[in-house]
Amino acid sequence: MDTIAITVDCSADDFEQVAAFWSAALGYERVLPSYLIDPAGVRPRLAFEIVPEPKVVKNRWHVDLYVENLDELEPRVRELVDLGAVVLHHLDEVTQGFTNVFTTLIDPGGNEFCVCAPH
């Protein structure tokens, strides 16, 4: 089986803050300054790479963090904000018979991600 690592591009100015944020947010171990692993060895690894160009548009893809139930959504969002994330918006809608409840945030490097409740 292949090992999956997700690489996050960062500026030199926010590299440390972004890596520290995701380590704390996911409970990952920081094995190198630019590399995080899941202590259980189950979830994808995260790598951080310093790039010279600034982020100028919305991500073409993003990470969704799922909580176990709707009651956990708001506390999880507060926890991530305390770690340095910023809330962009919250959505609670019914689409094609499914209830979508999620909050979109950005990490300290400006990368979008969502905290979602199961539908």
Question: Predicted segments — roles?
Answer:
Residues 1-19, 61, 116-119:
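N-terminal beta-strand motif that seeds the catalytic metal site of vicinal oxygen chelate
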Residues 2, 57-59, 97:
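Residue-level preference for beta-strand/loop junctions
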Residues 4, 43, 50, 79-81:
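Macromolecular interaction modules
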Residues 8-9, 34-39, 74-78:
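N-terminal start-of-chain detector that recognizes signal peptides
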Residues 14-29, 80-82:
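Amphipathic alpha-helical segments
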Residues 15, 63-109:
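Vicinal oxygen chelate
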Residues 22, 46-47, 90, 102, ...:
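Bulky hydrophobic/aromatic packing residues
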Residues 26-61, 67, 108, 112-117:
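Conserved short beta-strand elements that form part of the metal-binding/catalytic scaffold
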